[in-house]
Swiss-Prot record:
It is found in: Periplasm. Its main location: periplasm. SUPFAM superfamilies: Periplasmic binding protein-like II. It comes from Escherichia coli (strain K12). One of its GO terms (cellular component) is plasma membrane. The gene is ycjN. Disulfide bonds: none annotated. This is Putative ABC transporter periplasmic-binding protein YcjN. It holds the Pfam family SBP_bac_1. Probably part of the binding-protein-dependent transport system YcjNOP. Gene3D superfamilies: Periplasmic binding protein-like II. PANTHER family: ABC TRANSPORTER PERIPLASMIC-BINDING PROTEIN YCJN-RELATED (PTHR43649:SF34), ARABINOSE-BINDING PROTEIN-RELATED (PTHR43649). GO terms for biological process: transmembrane transport. Residues 1-19 form the signal peptide. Belongs to the bacterial solute-binding protein 1 family.
Length: 430
């Protein structure tokens, strides 16, 4: 019996030393990367990145899982319930909060990647947006961002003898002077529909006046003097916009067809501006009241919880690889101008410097990147990001509040009080 054990042990040792043993071939690990780039040209870019990674890491295979944006969140839920979540998932900072709340994120793995890349690799303020609610971890590794603000036609303002508006009062003055509803020309295109865009746009003004939906203790703070001032201002500003409920298409079309020389929109208006042929005629500004507040949405790559050790380690390697200068530049430049780099290394690459779109925009990309430290979002207070903000946005209470006082001409004080009550009840349920 002892002898047979020795023979078996010898065989195992021999097998371990011989490269031809079949067990050696089982070192390959396969991981999945879920993202929203369903367009063929974008998938081609990602395929090249994956091929580059696999060449550097011959034991790892990465499979793309492209999912339409509209079906994205549902797909995450479906896959999580069946225990088949991809190891790496592209996600907005908003949805990452939901994933973290459901304990779908491997916080330790995300922290490992951020440690590998270095916190200093990111622009100031970026990592703050992906902080967990308790401020102790991150929900993902940021790869790009878009921001929103006021876009304006330089020639129209110059012809009217008006300067770039720097604060609330100046913006209102410019909008009023350019407003000519009798001729179907309006001072500014603003979202007023019961939509996420309306909440995002209003949030810039509220946060600029130090009004937030939550306070540091996680209590709802909608019915405050600061929020009342912001809502009053937004209502006054909408007196100079197109009548009715305006959403994404109405705002964008009004700016692009000359109906309004100013508009609140994200950097995703830039492809249309470039196509128009004179991008340097368009300026960008974030009007400030008590402080500067720009709405921004970060895209991150997150690593999911519950995977095998070797899969998690492979995912860490892949996301770390994606943050290397040339790789992250290729990712960001799938949407040049519209998607902003959050990793400082991007602007040092030839991919960025030699891009025709970036060249055509002149100093604007640098100006937009310079706004990243000013990103503020509802539900983020200090180093805390309240996950319940997702429930607030999902409820539509804030956008309905704005819609009701602008389009519906409802009483401000009554509307604020009613909205506060609705959110108090909502938070008590969760």
């Amino acid at each position: 019996m002892i002898k047979s054990k020795i023979v078996l042990l010898s065989a195992l040792v021999s097998c371990a030393l011989i490269s031809g043993c079949k067990e050696e071939n089982k070192t390959n690990v396969s991981i999945e990367f879920m993202h929203s780039s369903v367009e063929q040209e974008r998938q081609a870019v990602i395929s090249k990145l994956i091929a580059r990674f696999e060449k550097e890491n011959p034991g790892i295979t990465v499979k793309q899982v492209p999912v339409e944006e509209d079906a994205y969140n549902t797909k995450v839920i479906t896959l999580s319930r069946s225990g088949s979540l991809p190891e790496v998932i592209e996600t907005s900072h908003d949805y990452a909060k939901v994933m973290d709340k459901e304990q779908l994120i491997d916080r330790k793995a995300v922290a490992t990647v951020i440690s590998n890349v270095g916190e200093g690799a990111f622009y100031d303020g970026v990592l703050r947006i992906v902080r967990t609610e308790d401020g102790s971890a991150w929900t993902g590794v940021p790869v790009s961002a878009w921001i929103g603000g006021i876009w304006y036609r330089k020639d129209v303002l110059a012809k009217a003898g008006l300067e770039e508006p720097k604060n609330w009062q100046q913006l209102l003055d410019v909008a009023q002077k350019l407003n000519d509803p009798a001729n179907k020309k309006y001072g500014i295109a603003l979202p007023t529909a019961e939509s996420v865009l309306t909440e995002q746009s209003f949030s810039q003004f509220a946060l600029s006046n130090q009004a937030n939906v939550f306070n540091a203790e996680g209590k709802i703070t909608l019915d405050t003097p600061e929020m009342m001032q912001a809502l009053t201002y937004y209502r006054d500003l909408t007196a100079n916009t197109m009548p009715g409920s305006n959403d994404i298409m109405e705002v964008k079309d009004a700016f692009m067809n000359g109906t309004a020389p100013m508009a609140i929109y994200s950097t995703y208006i830039l492809p249309a501006v470039i196509k128009e042929g004179d991008p340097k005629n368009v300026g960008f500004v974030v009007p400030t009241e008590k402080n500067s507040a720009v709405y921004g949405m970060l895209t991150s790559l997150t690593i999911t919880a519950g995977q095998k050790t070797e899969e998690t380690e492979a995912a860490e390697k892949f996301v770390t690889f994606m943050e290397q200068a040339d790789n992250i530049a290729d990712w960001v430049m799938m949407s040049p101008g519209a998607a902003l780099p959050v990793n400082k290394a991007v602007v040092t690459t030839a991919t960025w410097k030699d891009n025709d779109v970036i060249k055509a925009l002149g100093e604007l990309p640098n100006q937009l990147i310079g706004e990243l430290p000013n990103i503020q979002v509802f539900g983020a207070v200090g180093d805390k990001n309240f996950t319940r903000m997702g429930d607030v946005t999902g409820s539509g209470v804030v956008s309905s509040m704005v819609h009701n006082v602008t389009v519906g001409k409802a009483d401000l004080s009554t509307t604020l009080q009613a909205s506060q009550k609705k959110l108090d009840e909502l938070i008590e349920q969760h």
